[in-house]
């Protein structure tokens, strides 16, 4: 087992394949607004497909809160190309006199926020009921703050190297789970350093 930081770096340098081909994905949320800057009360446009089943364009908390989801990509260029294609399709098919709100904090919102509707199937009803619970618990305004989520995963070969580096008997999914949990613990501990 590598005891110190320099030994660990040397160990990883001997296995460059374990630090290549990261998986990346983006989930981007944005509000549909009217010309007057108020939240749209219109239903999810049919040109975007079903909010329940479409893999790339769905709704989040509110019917007007769009979410764009990229598949896992191995390169940043591939990731941005896909996200650009989603944006292009959405903008071309926006209903008349609607725009995408560019900021995370919501536009002017009246008291009523139409919850996302996913149809009459059991899973669709469950998703809408879940959002009703969020609305009751936290209020609508907190739920329509939009943002960008960057998803990141290490390649399977990394976890084999990680287990070897730590003399761990864990393999496969067990090694991944232990590694990601350790990463999260250390992020919470040292995350304040990142901005500096």
What residue ranges belong to the model's regions?
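Terminal catalytic/cofactor-binding subdomain
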Residues: 1-135, 142-144, 175, 182-185, ...
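Extended, regular secondary-structure scaffolds
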Residues: 153-196
